């Protein structure tokens, strides 16, 4: 589907595609393995396509939007009567995520990780063992799922 839109935009000499990945693409979390894997695919696919289209001078840019925790229904924990999976102070509003995604599109960026705390998380993930971070995140999720 992305290639179909990219071909159409290329014929018009410009356009932008925004694919939604996630912070989970950078920091895989136990108990969310399929989600993290699909988001990692979206991130990798988007970055590769961004470079392909940039090299071809198509005028089309592709951006991966990687939001962290966002105040949506996905953050509700039905096992605990709808209690949030994370503290509300960690949540971004959908509007904040959308605005940062649009800014990244306009700047022609291949990737945007929304929110300062999330960008710091990605930087730490790149510096330290993913295994250690996954264990910490896994403990947090397991303690909040029961």
Please place each PLM-identified region on the residue numbering:
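Active-site helix of classical SDR
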Residues: 2, 38
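Rossmann-fold scaffold of SDR-type NAD(P)-dependent oxidoreductases
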Residues: 19
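Active-site-adjacent segment of SDR/Rossmann-fold oxidoreductases
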Residues: 8-9, 27, 48-60
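Short-chain dehydrogenase/reductase
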Residues: 111-125, 138-139
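Residue(s) in the substrate-gating loop at a strand-loop-helix junction
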Residues: 22
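SDR active-site lid
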Residues: 52-117, 131-134
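A short helix-coil junction within the Rossmann-fold of NAD(P)-dependent oxidoreductases
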Residues: 4-13
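Active-site loop immediately N-terminal to the catalytic Tyr-X3-Lys motif
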Residues: 29-33
